[in-house]
Amino acid sequence: GRNWMVPEETVYAYLGTAKPKEGNGGILSCAVGNTSYMDVVKNSYYVDKTLLIRDLIDDQFPVILFTRPRRFGKTLALDMLKTFFEKTKEDTSIYFKDKQIWSCGEKYQKMQGAFPVISITFKDAKFSDWASTYVAIKNVIRDEFMRHDELFTSDTLNPAEQDYLSRMQTDELSDVEYAR
């Protein structure tokens, strides 16, 4: 099933902890198929994988390939990274203060919420023909860039880059420009 329920006392006995966590009648769900880090941490049992953040910061590889079978938490791990690094209006550090990454030191805490993050998934771009798939991919890219609308008024981008984003927003870019 998509919503396996594990009795709370069983999990705490296994983990050797008595820390209570509010849930649905004392029973929390296992987050099968949920890819939202914030939702999983708030409402489900979560095995702390935040040391992945430390590993990524320390190793500084230019490219990282996550290879795991289906349903092994790749998308959830990527959403955790996005939640950790992304600069947002709301304070997302609350989702990490009781996790292992927070006890690793100030070096890592300073990086929390410090960067604009582009996170793209094509999981919903499934169509039977290339033309529809291509339009869906363009929309995913455009929507992700538009999430960072603060760039339109910042000094971060030069005028050509601001024009590019403006034309992306109004769907005026050519196929060649999208490939840029």
Model-derived features with residue positions:
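A short, Lys/Arg-enriched interface patch at domain edges and termini
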Residues: 9-24
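Charged, amphipathic alpha-helical linker segments immediately N-terminal to NTP-binding catalytic cores
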Residues: 23-42
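Phosphate-binding P-loop
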Residues: 53-61
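Major-groove DNA-recognition helix of helix-turn-helix-type DNA-binding domains
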Residues: 1-5
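P-loop NTPase motor core
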Residues: 33, 38, 48, 54, ...
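Walker A/P-loop nucleotide-binding motif
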Residues: 62-80
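Hydrophobic residues on the short alpha-helix immediately C-terminal to a glycine-rich phosphate/catalytic loop
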Residues: 14, 56, 80-84
